[in-house]
Amino acid sequence: MKKTIKFLTALFSSASLLMSVPALAEYRTFDDGNITYGIFQAKPEEVQLHWKDAEGKDYQSLTRLKNALEPSYNVKMIMNAGIYSMNNTTAGLWIEHGKELNALNTKSGKGNFHVQPNGVFAIAKNKPYILTTSAYQKSKLKPDFALQSGPMLIIHGKINPQFRASLESYHKRNAVCLTKQNELLFLMTIKGEP
């Protein structure tokens, strides 16, 4: 019997969001001006991260990952996750099934990953967490799955002050968030520009 996974994330060499989402109760869209966003509500126990296959090779595409997983899982949604280098190595922390594949990155530098504070999304014992990198570093959390990315958009209910109205980056983006009720939501730009 196949296990159902309603949300999978993967690290790929393409920044574009490549996914096909069926009409699910957990998925909805909303429009804000000229932009359409998708929101997917997931249960933490249904979320997994996948970077490399059994031979240690990067999946390279969402289709390849989906094909690899479908014999064992009913895949409901896949999206890219994290920030990575040109050689397909994640820029920061990456943990799959409790095994650390890449260490936490606390270095300063240029680019989106280093806009501070950046953060860590983690699932430990089926509970989701979103922490700043420094808070994660101080925590005793032992996640089953975790990835470090950046920058954090909202911190404790307030927009990250590093973002200014004059910043212009109209690339399609995706994000993970927790509601006040600790519901896990994944958001993505579907179409449009401001």
Regions found by a protein language model. Give the residues of each.
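Short, solvent-exposed aromatic-acidic interface loops
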Residues: A54-D58, A135-S139, M188-E193
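Active-site-adjacent helix-turn-beta-strand microarchitecture at beta-sheet edges
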Residues: S85, T89-A165
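Bacterial N-terminal signal peptides
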Residues: T9-M19
